[in-house]
Design a protein with these regions (language model features):
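Acidic/His/Gly-enriched intrinsically disordered linker/tail segments
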Residues: 67, 72-83, 87-94, 110-246
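Juxtacatalytic substrate-recognition/specificity segment
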Residues: 5-116, 134, 198-205
Length: 247
């Protein structure tokens, strides 16, 4: 049962099974949600060259608290992937946690599951392309310009990665992943994704130390200017997020 004893409804598409509460926003939009996810699914599989032989199960919840209760750990969350096949996500009038991100996690684990969260989140953000509606590359350029940029080689450390705000680390790693793929090719990136030691794998696959790759990436990002109006909007979004966390 969902919140308030709401009955659970189900909807099945070619590659998904959706669960959601009766008379919720998810129930109202379920046909659109299923169609949207099917398009995301096909693109991810096309890029990664793999396709699950099972259906992905989506648990669409009205609140972060409901996500925690349905999953069973009672830890409020907007969305996350629970391998091998489940995704829990908030879907309401204000928050719609659907799209590429969690599906990319589940599907990419058919290739491998590299240890650094930065690499896994970077690939998911590569598919997302945007954070808060703004391109990963623009965020990375903004962070570089304002002194907030965090080096990608440092982010390979799990502890260091989680010490920093995901609003900074996720777009940076998404843009870095995009740069690796566009610079060296998809095949080499998939070779890297399969490495047990990512730092050593960068040397093996790309012939460069992680710090060298970071510097080349930062130099590339620095080639692009950002519209002042967009910079102002990014500053506003970061300030709003900071205010929400402190309230």
């Amino acid at each position: 049962m969902y919140e308030g004893g709401t009955a659970v409804e189900h909807f099945e598409s070619e590659h998904y099974i959706f669960h959601y509460g009766e008379n919720t926003k998810a129930a109202e939009d379920i046909s659109h949600i299923a169609d949207y996810q099917e398009h995301c699914f096909r693109y991810i599989c096309s890029v990664l060259g793999v396709c699950p032989d099972f259906k992905l199960e989506y648990f669409l919840c009205s609140t972060p608290e409901e996500v925690g209760r349905i999953y069973g750990d009672n830890d409020p969350c907007n969305g996350f992937a629970a391998p091998p096949d489940k995704i829990y996500a908030v879907y309401n009038e204000q928050v719609t946690c659907i799209g590429f991100h969690e599906d990319a996690h589940i599907i990419s684990y058919l290739v491998d599951r590299p240890d650094p969260p930065a690499i896994r989140e970077g690939l998911a953000m590569y598919f997302d392309r945007k954070w808060w509606g703004i391109q990963n590359l623009d965020w990375t350029g903004f962070y570089l310009k304002t002194g907030r940029y965090v080096p990608t080689d440092k982010l390979l450390d799990r502890t260091f990665f989680f010490e920093h705000d995901c609003a900074i680390t996720y777009p940076i790693m998404g843009a870095f992943t995009d740069w690796l793929i566009s610079s060296f090719g998809q095949e080499k990136y998939m070779q890297l994704y399969r490495q047990q030691d990512i730092a050593a794998g960068m040397v093996q696959v790309y012939g460069k130390e992680p710090a060298e790759l970071n510097q080349a990436f930062a130099d590339y990002v620095g080639l692009f200017s950002i519209d002042p109006v967009l910079e102002q909007r990014m500053a506003e979004l970061l300030n709003e997020a900071s205010t929400d966390k402190s309230s």
